[in-house]
Amino acid sequence: MAIGVNQLLIILVIIVLLFGAKKIPELAKGLGKGIKSFKAEMEDDKPIEKVEKKGDDVVDAKVEETTKNA
């Protein structure tokens, strides 16, 4: 069951009646920005390479505690 040209025209007329001809470009622009933002966020979710920790890079440090008597 495919959507034909007649059904698409009816849907378009209903959208124009609901939102008005002036509002449709604004809605399309907002939808486009949302899709672009979604795609950008999906690209950011690529797996991050794990960093291997080696014992050779560990630095030993000694912490000295100083106290002042008031």
UniProtKB/Swiss-Prot annotation:
It comes from the Bacteria. The keyword Cell membrane applies. Keywords: Cell inner membrane, Cell membrane, Membrane, Protein transport, Translocation, Transmembrane, Transmembrane helix, Transport. One of its GO terms (cellular component) is TAT protein transport complex. One of its GO terms (biological process) is protein transport by the Tat complex. It is a single-pass membrane protein. The keyword Transmembrane helix applies. It is found in: Cell inner membrane. The chain crosses the membrane at residues 1-21. Pfam families: TatA_B_E. Its main location: membrane. HAMAP family: TatA_E (MF_00236). Belongs to the TatA/E family. NCBIfam families: tatAE. This is Sec-independent protein translocase protein TatA. It comes from Campylobacter curvus (strain 525.92). The lineage of its organism: Bacteria, Pseudomonadati, Campylobacterota, Epsilonproteobacteria, Campylobacterales. The gene is tatA.
